[in-house]
Swiss-Prot record:
BP GO terms, sorted: innate immune response; negative regulation of innate immune response
Residue ranges, compositional bias (Polar residues): 31-41, 51-67
Record's compositionally biased regions (Low complexity): 94-104
Name of the protein described by the UniProt record: AT-hook motif nuclear-localized protein 15
The organism of origin for this protein: Arabidopsis thaliana
Pfam families referenced in this protein's UniProt entry, alphabetically: PCC
Other comments on record: Overexpression of AHL15 results in a decreased flg22-induced expression of FRK1.
Principal location: nucleus
Underlying gene: AHL15
Function of the molecule: Transcription factor that specifically binds AT-rich DNA sequences related to the nuclear matrix attachment regions (MARs). Binds the DNA sequence GNFEI (GA-negative feedback element I) in the GA3OX1 promoter. Negatively regulates plant innate immunity (PTI) to pathogens through the down-regulation of the PAMP-triggered FRK1 expression.
Keyword flag Transcription regulation: yes
A Gene Ontology molecular function term of the record: minor groove of adenine-thymine-rich DNA binding
Amino acid sequence: MANPWWVGNVAIGGVESPVTSSAPSLHHRNSNNNNPPTMTRSDPRLDHDFTTNNSGSPNTQTQSQEEQNSRDEQPAVEPGSGSGSTGRRPRGRPPGSKNKPKSPVVVTKESPNSLQSHVLEIATGADVAESLNAFARRRGRGVSVLSGSGLVTNVTLRQPAASGGVVSLRGQFEILSMCGAFLPTSGSPAAAAGLTIYLAGAQGQVVGGGVAGPLIASGPVIVIAATFCNATYERLPIEEEQQQEQPLQLEDGKKQKEENDDNESGNNGNEGSMQPPMYNMPPNFIPNGHQMAQHDVYWGGPPPRAPPSY
């Protein structure tokens, strides 16, 4: 039985078979035939589909090649670069985010009550105590002597056990310790200023006391001192009368302040809470010689409102 879709000869794979009512016969391949095998369809729509498929296949292949070339031309995104959506973020701090060194704090203005340290060098032949006293007056600041070192000669010390309370020592002595204070004003108490020194003699004896006369430096004398300003003079112990007067003054001041505050708050409250006179009575009206209290008037609640006028 013949296939109604095929008309004429059908050449498939180089085998030619005529369309007959019987089965097609087989023949040997003709190697000299250069024409490509063809198929003939009786339906024109199938011919159109076959032609369209054959003509569209090269275009599809060309389009796929162009897409592959465009993918190859695109640069690869490095991991961690941050330019791609799938790129990993770099770990750690970004560059330049570390703590930068801060500039040092410079104090441009010093407090007048602050202490200033000094290293003073007293020349040979100068009086140590007089030099320190002159330095305090010239600078206008008090001088607190912390320590000293050097050699001195012809020392006059104050000692209560000696006759007259003063001892004059001749020779050269080494300073072991020295402390004291000098105030810039001449009217300061004598006990508040002065110099106390301990000396070692050539034979190992140690003497000390308050300097009561010249203290001549026989070599360079180094003094470590601190200067101060705005020193307050206090007399101790504080007397009992002063201790009692101060609390009384504080209590009186507190009471007076509280009274003033109460008066101010009362005035403000009265101004804010003033009510219109009740029962057409003047505000200064005093019934039965006594002023009517507010709670006597309002104990029954506020009066009813007048009906609106139509």
